[in-house]
Amino acid sequence: MKTLIRKFSRTAITVVLVILAFIAIFNAWVYYTESPWTRDARFSADVVAIAPDVSGLITQVNVHDNQLVKKGQVLFTIDQPRYQKALEEAQADVAYYQVLAQEKRQEAGRRNRLGVQAMSREEIDQANNVLQTVLHQLAKAQATRDLAKLDLERTVIRAPADGWVTNLNVYTGEFITRGSTAVALVKQNSFYVLAYMEETKLEGVRPGYRAEITPLGSNKVLKGTVDSVAAGVTNASSTRDDKGMATIDSNLEWVRLAQRVPVRIRLDNQQENIWPAGTTATVVVTGKQDRDESQDSFFRKMAHRLREFG
């Protein structure tokens, strides 16, 4: 009898432990799969594509790739002598038309004072028309001069903001055309994280909620705040035909892949971030407040570790 009771007790204890373990693992798995988190996240930053507004030979490159530069710092210079000559020519034209306009103004004023008693109305009108033509030419010459001055100023390409020069692909002696991208500038203190959350997890994501960011290959956890959630994504299942009619792709009702929606996360401390734009991270949205690790259960901690390494 005692042996039977002992066997039953062992069996009961084993069953209870298995059930408890199953419940714990199930809860950890639910927390792992349904709470708002994703491994599909990227560090991003504001990037300025720098292109010259004038064409010409590059005469000097003042920076090197991946250099940190300050706003207004010279990046490279384009053939200035040519644009200096163009400015001098435009200034000479302005000076010529200024003198000519003064002469025609005096002539028109003299004829207007003498009036029709000394000459015909046609001669007076002709003098006034010549003056207006010269004034128009003077205005055009001044505009050309201002444009030449602007072109000369823009032969010196400067950094529009503090940041890092990246993908520098210009060299002294090369010819560069107007509008062609020469270098990218990653703005300093503009880094953020784009987390691509599955639509099934968006219920736990709101602007202002706190987030944890773990870069791939690192145990360092950065803190951030949900800044915004994208208002829409492309509908890959619907297109338009050549007549404007909607074309809907067929799908299997029992197999539905969750869409991913971009969630922008603002980093608390820009100075702590050493990860370049485009690198991967894991993001966990913890809710209105930061997660208190001391209050986490063993299985919840295990779920967090699964997120990092899974």
UniProtKB/Swiss-Prot annotation:
Family of this protein: Belongs to the membrane fusion protein (MFP) (TC 8.A.1) family.
Keyword hit for Transmembrane helix: yes
Protein name: p-hydroxybenzoic acid efflux pump subunit AaeA
Function: Forms an efflux pump with AaeB.
Protein's UniProt keywords contain Transmembrane: yes
Principal cellular location given in the protein's record: membrane
Subcellular location: Cell inner membrane
